[in-house]
Curated annotation (Swiss-Prot):
ATP binds at residues 10-18, 37, 118. Keywords: Amino-acid biosynthesis, Arginine biosynthesis, ATP-binding, Cytoplasm, Ligase, Nucleotide-binding. L-aspartate binds at residues 120, 124-125. HAMAP family: Arg_succ_synth_type1 (MF_00005). This is Argininosuccinate synthase. It is found in: Cytoplasm. It catalyses: L-citrulline + L-aspartate + ATP = 2-(N(omega)-L-arginino)succinate + AMP + diphosphate + H(+). Homotetramer. One of its GO terms (cellular component) is cytoplasm. The keyword tRNA processing does not apply.
Length: 405
């Protein structure tokens, strides 16, 4: 194998990355540094430390990145009202650039000459991790075991773990039949019965949300306060970004909000079915569009909507650290200077309903928009010239005998 002295491994403590840890030690005869990120996945991360220590790891990083994740990645993404292919709120995609960033930082701190991850050769995550790594440290070596080894089934991974005395749970607690990924923004489910696109997902699959049918019969109202496009308070109580999202996840989950069952187009070329729970993100998206509806200029809002699919695609395909994403982000952030105010929402059985919005920076003028007497604020006769000028090119074409079809 290539000359590698030290590798930083993105380590969850689960079967796959525990096998990768031992495989790296044996295959590359190198020192391994483990990095475990707490992104609000709801699982205890400290057991990863004990497992890594038992496998001889001397340098172990377990970082609480929840605030950085929401403040520097989730919130900037939501300023753009970002949705991939009309539905997906990019919960997995947006977490990968932060993990890649921290992998490189640790590699620099520890003098490691390589990083490694547990993403398979079929998915998007390998691209996201590695594009980020190369953008931040061009000369870094990336080791992707799933593209090198022959352990291509869970059973082979289990056998390898037993052979090398890697602590695992072959028996005991029932394992989920789905491949799952979770952080503060969402939880995803893939595989199992979901690989048949006609088979309905099972109700007991969902972990964060109740079914809309079983949600409370009484709606709940929320008020979200925005400053420069970001939520800063919930029902008048100021909160940190991570606390905002965690609170909205809890409340939204209680009302059956944020379930999604989609087939998406992966960057590597295949279609993949996934189910997602994004209760807080679903609320945030609806509320942000509502506050923008009264604070953004029409053409700015329309331009943002035109650019959003490109921005979403850049995040989905791993180009968070690219110059084009950074350029778009500057434009998006500039549009949020006046996105301030309060949005009132009603949550009811899976629905997020906007019931009010107000802002000192509002462009809504009731005197002009009213259906009642406006006192001369708007001269309706002006509309005639406006319409004629906008119709001019079509009138010319018709006068020239141009056929429409």
């Amino acid at each position: 194998m290539a000359d590698v002295n030290k590798v930083v491994l993105a380590y969850s403590g689960g079967l796959d990355t525990s096998v990768i840890l031992k495989w790296l030690q044996d295959t590359y005869n190198c020192e391994v540094v483990t990095f475990t990120a707490d992104l609000g996945q709801g699982e205890e991360v400290e057991p990863a430390r004990a497992k890594a220590q038992a496998m001889g790891v001397k340098e172990i990083y377990i970082d609480d990145l929840r605030e950085e994740f929401v403040r520097d990645f989730v919130f900037p993404m939501f300023r753009a009202n970002t949705v991939y292919e009309g539905e997906y709120l990019l919960g997995t995609s947006i977490a990968r650039p932060l993990i890649a960033k921290r992998l490189i930082e640790i590699a620099n701190e520890t003098g490691a000459d390589a990083i490694s991850h547990g993403a398979t050769g079929k998915g998007n995550d390998q691209v996201r991790f590695e594009l980020g790594a190369y953008a931040l440290k061009p000369g870094v070596k990336v080791i992707a075991p799933w593209r090198e080894w022959d352990l291509l089934s869970r059973e082979k991974l289990m056998d390898y773990a037993e052979k090398h005395a890697i602590p695992i749970e072959r028996h005991g607690k029932k394992k989920s039949p789905y491949s799952m990924d979770a952080n503060l923004l969402h939880i995803s489910y893939e595989g199992g019965v979901l690989e048949d696109t006609w088979t309905e997902h099972e109700e007991d699959m969902w972990r964060w949300t109740v079914s809309p049918e079983k949600a409370p019969d009484t709606p709940q109202y929320l008020e979200l306060t925005y400053r420069n496009g970001d939520i800063v308070a919930l029902d008048g109580v100021e909160m940190t970004p991570a606390t905002v999202l965690a609170t909205l996840n809890r409340i939204g989950g209680e009302h059956g909000i944020g379930r999604l069952d989609i087939v998406e187009n992966r960057y590597v070329g295949m279609k993949s079915r996934g189910c997602y729970e994004t209760p807080g993100g679903t609320i945030m998206l609806r509320a942000h569009r509502a506050i923008e509806s009264i604070t953004l200029d029409r053409e700015v809002a329309h331009l943002k909507d035109e650019l959003m699919p490109k921005y979403a695609s850049l995040i989905y395909t791993g180009y968070w650290w690219s110059p084009e994403r950074l350029m778009l982000q500057q434009m998006i952030d500039a549009s949020q200077v006046n996105v301030n105010g309060v949005v009132r929402l009603k949550l009811y059985k899976g629905n997020v309903i906007v019931t009010g919005r107000k802002s000192d920076d509002s462009l809504f003028d009731a005197n002009i928009a009213t259906f009642e007497e406006d006192g001369g604020a708007y001269n309706q006769a002006d509309a005639a010239g406006f319409i004629k000028l906008n119709a001019l090119r079509m009138r010319i074409a018709a006068n020239k005998g141009r056929k429409l079809f």
